[in-house]
């Protein structure tokens, strides 16, 4: 049985969507046990009796806009729903943690409580992103390391390759190195050095350099760069998707015929378009480099999306993704 700790109060839609997503997961997967940490009074309207569900009460939780995160957090906020869930994993009472709470707090607390795996030199944020090809695609590092080295990016590529193989069944995910041109000699020193490392590694199916204009349409399912570049890419993708949606709505509403066409012919295609650009189907961001499984669900996750974040976590545990990453990294260090 896979045991997961859930931050019941993290996220814009907590606790309702978090609790309901957890219950969906219990109904969908018969090999998990969940412990939800949060304010029982606020969660009560959405809770059910279930033999594989435990609830631990705490009235404290992190607001989504929290900024003051530091060493004092581990001492002063240890009874928040997020830190109690992380501590459950630290104490060996759960195999992984899922939270929609503030990213900075989750990464900081996980780093110092669960600890990084010794084999990886940095921790990275690895969100799943929607693309035109409609296949599971990871972007990393989405903001964790703006001063990364080539060896760190290689570690991130290895982690993502194993995660896509084990969690999503991708046989040979291609790694694309985000760069200003496709030629091997393009980019900064870190890009050139990373290109060489990726080209030579036996586990990596290297796509080559990937120009930003190709990100949504290429066959690469791992979009790799340092935290500064990848974070800009992620936010540009979010902004572009939002802008396209607004433009489409504006044009449809501009005339009677546009509205009629939307009702008669475009309803299903628009629904499919929205689903293809949504991360709800694939879950949350993986936190690469920690000694246990940590999944950061989107802050605005609704029940279905949170259920899929739980599915991510439970599959990572059942397929021993962390152990397999460690074995590969140990092998290359010997």
Curated annotation (Swiss-Prot):
Record-listed E.C. numbers: 2.3.1.274
Presence of the UniProt keyword Hydrolase in the record: no
SUPFAM superfamilies: Isocitrate/Isopropylmalate dehydrogenase-like
Pathway: Lipid metabolism; phospholipid metabolism
GO annotation terms (biological process): fatty acid biosynthetic process; phospholipid biosynthetic process
GO molecular function, one term: phosphate:acyl-[acyl carrier protein] acyltransferase activity
Gene3D superfamilies according to UniProt: Isopropylmalate Dehydrogenase (3.40.718.10)
InterPro entries: FA_synthesis, Phospholipid_synth_PlsX-like
Tree of life domain: Bacteria
Keywords: Cytoplasm, Lipid biosynthesis, Lipid metabolism, Phospholipid biosynthesis, Phospholipid metabolism, Transferase
A Pfam family of this chain: FA_synthesis
Cell compartments where the protein resides: Cytoplasm
GO terms under cellular component: cytoplasm
Protein's UniProt keywords contain Acyltransferase: no
Catalyses which reaction(s): a fatty acyl-[ACP] + phosphate = an acyl phosphate + holo-[ACP]
Protein's job: Catalyzes the reversible formation of acyl-phosphate (acyl-PO(4)) from acyl-[acyl-carrier-protein] (acyl-ACP). This enzyme utilizes acyl-ACP as fatty acyl donor, but not acyl-CoA.
Family (UniProt): Belongs to the PlsX family.
UniProt subunit comment: Homodimer. Probably interacts with PlsY.
UniProt name for this protein: Phosphate acyltransferase
Gene that encodes it: plsX
């Amino acid at each position: 049985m896979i045991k997961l700790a859930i931050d019941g109060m993290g996220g814009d839609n907590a606790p309702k969507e978090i609790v309901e997503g957890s219950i969906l997961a219990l109904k969908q997967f018969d090999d998990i046990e969940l412990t939800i940490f949060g304010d029982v009074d606020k969660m009560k309207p959405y809770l059910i009796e279930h033999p594989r569900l435990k609830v631990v009460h705490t009235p404290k939780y992190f607001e989504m806009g929290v900024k003051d995160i530091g060493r004092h957090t581990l001492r002063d906020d240890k009874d928040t729903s997020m830190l109690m869930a992380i501590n459950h994993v630290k104490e060996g009472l759960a195999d992984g943690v899922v939270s929609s709470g503030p990213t900075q707090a989750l990464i900081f607390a996980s780093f110092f409580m669960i600890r990084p795996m010794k084999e990886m030199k940095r921790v990275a944020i690895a969100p799943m992103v929607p693309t035109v090809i409609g296949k599971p695609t990871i972007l990393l590092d989405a903001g964790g390391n703006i001063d990364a080295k080539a060896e760190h990016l290689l570690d991130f590529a290895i982690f993502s390759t194993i995660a896509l193989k084990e969690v999503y069944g991708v046989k040979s995910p291609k790694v694309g190195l985000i760069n200003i041109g496709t030629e091997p000699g393009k980019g900064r020193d870190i890009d050139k050095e990373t290109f060489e490392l990726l080209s030579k590694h036996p586990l990596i199916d290297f796509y080559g350099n990937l120009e930003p204009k190709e990100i949504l349409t290429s066959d690469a399912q791992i979009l790799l760069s340092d935290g500064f570049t990848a974070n800009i890419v992620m936010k540009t993708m979010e902004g572009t998707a939002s802008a396209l949606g607004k433009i489409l709505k504006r044009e449809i509403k501009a005339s009677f015929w546009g509205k009629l066409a939307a009702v008669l012919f475009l309803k299903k295609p628009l629904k499919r378009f929205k689903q293809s650009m949504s991360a709800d189907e694939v879950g949350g961001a993986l936190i690469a480099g920690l000694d246990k499984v940590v999944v950061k669900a989107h802050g605005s996750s609704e029940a279905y999306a949170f259920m899929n974040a739980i599915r991510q976590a439970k599959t990572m545990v059942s397929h021993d993704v962390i152990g397999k990453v460690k074995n590969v990294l140990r092998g290359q260090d010997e």
